[in-house]
């Protein structure tokens, strides 16, 4: 009998919590997963796999954010290494747009220092509010 068996009581509680979590996670009015990637082959492939896993459970995907993109600059003024990285990143940004059509919500720059503290968080928030319209 359920009322007398502590294991069954615990399992019933776990089942209820799991059902509540599933209901919340699959409710597109309350939940959406956003994935953050870098403009590199492996992180893009990982996010692609994660998105398919999340969608398999009917969990809404809100979009993809591409982080740490080197801002556009006059390549003649850059070191060959940085100029090459910029070119590589442009190719990976195109790949991300192909793999996640209509899902890129923001492209965030590579900042000169780690995002730490109010000033940097404010800059990151501003970049996020610009979304994919930001000029990187």
Where are these regions (language model features)?
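A general structural motif
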Residues: 10-19
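Basic, amphipathic N-terminal segments
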Residues: 1-6
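C-terminal lobe/tail of nucleotide-utilizing enzymes
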Residues: 18-136
């Amino acid at each position: 009998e359920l009322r007398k068996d502590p294991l069954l009581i615990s399992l019933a509680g776990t089942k209820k919590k799991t059902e509540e979590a599933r209901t919340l996670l699959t409710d597109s009015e309350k939940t959406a997963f956003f994935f953050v990637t870098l403009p590199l082959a492996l992180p893009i492939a990982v996010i692609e796999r994660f998105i398919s896993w999340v969608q398999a459970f009917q969990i809404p995907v809100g979009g993809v954010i591409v982080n740490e993109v080197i801002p556009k600059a006059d390549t003649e003024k850059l070191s060959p290494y940085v100029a090459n990285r910029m070119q590589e990143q442009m190719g990976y940004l195109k790949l991300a747009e192909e793999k996640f059509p209509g899902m890129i919500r923001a492209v965030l720059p590579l900042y000169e220092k780690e995002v730490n503290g109010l000033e940097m968080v404010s800059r990151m928030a501003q970049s996020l509010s610009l979304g994919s319209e930001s000029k990187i």
